[in-house]
């Protein structure tokens, strides 16, 4: 495909117009009195939302230079959303403000590289001030307050607080569709995985078609269980104890399966066979998780263990196991707390080190099954459009609440940024800057007022008046746009997670630095649209 190239001011101006088109669309949603944006769809009903990243994703501009500018800001919104689940609009507004302030200086002849260094240094100091000002989340009400602000719905805030209170920080909260109107909250006790019984003959409870094993032994093997002698040895060991047996294996087939089923039907020996979840290395890891949870050892050729020669020491134990057609739940495994804690620490380290979003999600699920639990918020609404929009807001609010637990809370409404910047301006790392680096730092201190101004203007109040008033207030006090009052925002429940505010500023500063140091843009040349056929052409005359 042919390319078009522009340089210097022309390049930056084209990108700036694209950035402004996207940012001006997104920023009307900021704050408690922010407006909605309607997104037209190629098929189906339009979507109505006030979620910054959803709006940004839908914007695709025709002009190639404008498209590149818009894509840069989309990256800010997406990165902030991925890390913290909220703050996308704040990040977009900050990026726009930083770029505008920076370009004024670039046009006036400042060195973009020096400006970028100044922006980075000022951002680093402000982030330190934000972290220092953080307040730990101590109550369920604080979680509810921050989730309520993110989702703009008190009922959602309460459900998320209840879910996280139950499953803990390491637990997983998933959001699913509900067949009926409203919100429902379900909890999973113990470790649950999505594999059910291999054959319905293992069912013990005909009413709900489940196999319930009380105080069972648990055999975990990474291979197939096929021959009769594979199973007879283990079955005889367990039969002597009078307890049931759960077998989790790659598969149970051949002579082994009918042997188990026949003994089950006769009442000679109660058991249930389940396929191991996952594939490949992930299956091995999940089997090892189960082994640690239940105090078992995985029987595998790699370890030199054979089914025909094992004893009860390799079998795990649990208080109860419930197996349905589609899933298995292990309740109160008998593994040692020390081993479980060590495994949890190992999975946490893997989460920190992975670059793959998919791997991180799967590791988080494993962590939840070992350390916390799983809560499911079921969402129902009058229309499919409303349900989809509400579901998305709840997913964001869950990540927002987890971010608050992880790094703490700050006063919301853009106030924390302004107050942290006021302290950062006096820090030696900033006052020691000279020349154009000092100019770069000054750009950050001016641009950082943009979110609070936008929140005020969306609420119908002068942004400049609000900024001047907030500067004179003690730390933690600011403008509550929901009530049009100045008050202690932490006490009023108007809070933002540190992670959200920090990520928004860092991502905005990163993109602004790239924008200012751009000297050329290479874009795809738009393909000419084919001309419409002349009237009367190809009519057979």
From Swiss-Prot:
EC identifiers of the protein: 5.6.1.7
The protein's assembly and partners: Forms a cylinder of 14 subunits composed of two heptameric rings stacked back-to-back. Interacts with the co-chaperonin GroES.
Role description: Together with its co-chaperonin GroES, plays an essential role in assisting protein folding. The GroEL-GroES system forms a nano-cage that allows encapsulation of the non-native substrate proteins and provides a physical environment optimized to promote and accelerate protein folding.
Keyword Cell membrane listed: no
Entry binding sites for ATP: 29-32, 86-90, 413, 480-482, 496
Localisation per UniProt entry: Cytoplasm
Gene transcribed to yield this protein: groEL
NCBIfam families hit by this protein: GroEL, PRK00013.1, PRK12849.1, PRK12850.1, PRK12851.1
Keywords: ATP-binding, Chaperone, Cytoplasm, Isomerase, Nucleotide-binding
GO cellular component annotations of the record: cytoplasm
Source organism, top-level taxon: Bacteria
UniProt cross-references to SUPFAM superfamilies, sorted A to Z: GroEL apical domain-like, GroEL equatorial domain-like, GroEL-intermediate domain like
Family: Belongs to the chaperonin (HSP60) family.
Reaction it catalyzes: ATP + H2O + a folded polypeptide = ADP + phosphate + an unfolded polypeptide
One Pfam family, short name: Cpn60_TCP1
Keyword ATP-binding: yes
Name of the molecule in the record: Chaperonin GroEL
């Amino acid at each position: 495909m042919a390319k078009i190239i522009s340089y210097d001011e022309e390049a930056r101006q084209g990108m700036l117009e694209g950035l402004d088109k996207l940012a001006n669309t997104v920023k009307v949603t900021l704050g408690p009195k922010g407006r909605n944006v309607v997104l037209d769809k190629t098929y189906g009903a339009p979507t109505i939302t006030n979620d910054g990243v959803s709006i940004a994703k839908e914007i695709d501009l025709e002009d190639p230079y404008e498209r590149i500018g818009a894509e840069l800001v989309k990256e800010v919104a997406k990165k902030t959303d991925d890390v913290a689940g909220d703050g996308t609009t704040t990040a977009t507004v900050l990026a726009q403000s930083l770029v505008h302030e920076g370009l004024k200086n670039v046009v006036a002849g400042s060195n973009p590289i020096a400006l970028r260094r100044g922006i980075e240094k000022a951002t680093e100091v402000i982030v330190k001030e934000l972290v220092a000002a953080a307040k730990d989340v101590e109550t369920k009400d604080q979680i509810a307050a921050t989730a309520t602000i993110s989702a703009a719905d008190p009922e959602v805030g309460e459900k998320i607080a209840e879910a996280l209170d139950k499953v803990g920080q390491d637990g997983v909260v998933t959001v699913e569709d509900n067949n009926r109107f409203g919100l429902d909250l379900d909890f999973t006790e113990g470790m649950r995985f999505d594999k059910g019984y291999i054959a319905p003959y293992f069912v013990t409870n005909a009413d709900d078609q489940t196999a319930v094993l009380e105080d069972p032994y648990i055999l975990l093997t990474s291979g197939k269980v096929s021959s009769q002698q594979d199973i007879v040895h283990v079955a005889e060991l367990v039969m002597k104890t009078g307890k049931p047996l759960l077998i989790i294996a790659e598969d149970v087939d051949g002579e082994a399966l009918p042997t188990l089923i026949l003994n089950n039907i006769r009442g000679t020996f109660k058991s249930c066979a389940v396929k191991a979840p996952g594939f490949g290395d992930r299956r091995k890891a999940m089997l090892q998780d189960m082994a640690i949870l239940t105090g078992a050892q995985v029987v595998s050729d790699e370890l030199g263990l054979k089914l025909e020669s094992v004893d009860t020491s390799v079998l795990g134990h649990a208080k109860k196991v419930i197996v349905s057609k589609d899933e298995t739940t292990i309740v109160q495994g008998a593994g040692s707390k020390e081993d479980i804690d060590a495994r949890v620490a190992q999975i946490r380290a893997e989460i920190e080190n992975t670059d793959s979003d998919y791997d991180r999600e799967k590791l988080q699920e494993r962590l939840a099954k070992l350390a916390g639990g799983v809560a499911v918020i079921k969402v129902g609404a009058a229309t499919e459009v409303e349900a989809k929009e509400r579901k998305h807001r709840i997913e964001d609010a869950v990540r927002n609440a987890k971010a608050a637990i992880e790094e703490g809370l700050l006063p919301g409404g853009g106030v924390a940024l302004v107050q942290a910047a006021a302290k950062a301006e006096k820090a030696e790392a900033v006052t020691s800057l000279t020349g154009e680096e000092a100019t770069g730092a000054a750009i950050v201190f001016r641009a950082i007022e943009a979110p609070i101004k936008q929140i005020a203007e969306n609420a119908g109040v002068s942004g400049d008046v609000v900024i001047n008033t907030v500067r004179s207030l003690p730390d933690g006090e600011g403008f509550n746009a929901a009530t049009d009052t100045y008050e202690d925002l932490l006490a009023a429940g108007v809070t933002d997670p540190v992670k959200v505010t920090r990520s928004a500023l860092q991502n905005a500063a990163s993109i602004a630095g790239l924008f200012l140091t751009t000297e050329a843009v290479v874009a795809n040349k738009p393909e000419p649209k084919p001309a419409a056929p002349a009237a009367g052409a190809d009519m057979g005359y």
